[in-house]
């Protein structure tokens, strides 16, 4: 689906210069064959909304030799274990859906910090989630608590920026988090529109980037992330 500003009711099938198909398997194959990407981020919107994860789709994509990062609306350890059994490469635990810090800590301890990526979900800069514990907390506080729980991989994602192509809007936050928590693998996404956005993120302590629309519309090509300053080894693709 083509994400637009986090307004999921307005999401539409992807239109891409890379493939005529909007099916996840075909899109992943195009990322691999046309762009040389070997890792793919997938947001399972139905699972995030409470439906069962689309495990068959995950397996099909992974059969291409593509390592899959999946956000499937993990709430508790049981949800995370189901994705682990599906051999998902990176399990994304989103602030939007996680039951609370206790569940996050349990998942991190059980599966290990290398497997778990905590998504600091924001909307227009404000934390997005149903957890009472973090109600009213700012993004920096939540990130620090996540680190204290064992998180070592953090995604900063402002859903209001998704698909807009005007930058992530989180550069200052990322810079502060990188300074406060140098042990973090810090990833940013939402709104990346061109190579200049990648460069700006790298200059502010970001280790990797999630990109979708800029790949589908041709604004970013492999030569853009293979520049000496780029996030080449970490560039991820998003669906």
Cite the ranges covered by each PLM segment:
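Conserved anion-binding
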Residues: 1-17, 84, 88-162
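Catalytic cores of alpha/beta
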Residues: 64, 68-91, 172-211
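Glycine-rich, proline-tolerant flexible connector loops at the mouths of alpha/beta enzymes
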Residues: 39-56, 155-166
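Short, acidic/polar
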Residues: 20-33, 76-81, 134-145, 198
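Short beta-strand/loop segments at the ligand-binding rim of alpha/beta enzyme cores
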Residues: 57, 62-70, 113-117, 121-131, ...
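C-terminal helical cap(s) of enzyme catalytic domains, especially alpha/beta-barrels
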Residues: 103-111, 198, 202-234, 238
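Charged helix-capping and loop-helix junction motifs
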Residues: 52-59, 132-141, 166-175
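Conserved, mostly hydrophobic/aromatic
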Residues: 40, 83, 118, 154, ...
């Amino acid at each position: 689906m083509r994400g637009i500003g986090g307004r999921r009711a307005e999401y539409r099938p992807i239109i891409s210069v890379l493939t005529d198909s909007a099916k996840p398997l075909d899109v992943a194959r195009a990322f691999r064959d046309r762009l040389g990407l070997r890792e793919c981020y997938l947001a399972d919107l139905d699972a995030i909304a409470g439906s069962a994860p689309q495990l068959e789709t995950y397996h099909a994509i992974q059969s291409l030799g593509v390592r899959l990062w999946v956000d499937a609306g993990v709430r508790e350890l049981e949800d995370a274990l189901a994705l682990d059994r599906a051999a998902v490469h990176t399990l994304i635990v989103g602030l939007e859906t996680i039951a609370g810090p206790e569940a996050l800590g349990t998942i991190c301890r059980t599966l290990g910090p290398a497997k778990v990526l905590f998504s600091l979900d924001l909307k227009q800069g404000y934390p997005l989630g149903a957890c009472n514990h973090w109600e009213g907390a700012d993004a920096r506080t939540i990130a620090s608590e996540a680190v204290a729980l064992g998180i070592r991989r953090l995604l900063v994602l402002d859903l209001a920026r998704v698909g807009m192509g005007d930058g992530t809007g989180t550069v200052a936050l990322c810079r502060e988090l990188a300074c406060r928590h140098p042990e973090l693998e810090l990833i940013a996404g939402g709104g990346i529109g061109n190579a200049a956005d990648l460069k700006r993120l790298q200059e502010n302590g970001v280790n990797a980037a999630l990109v979708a629309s800029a790949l589908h519309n041709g604004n970013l090509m492999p030569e853009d992330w293979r520049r000496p300053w780029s996030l080449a080894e970490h560039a991820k693709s998003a669906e």
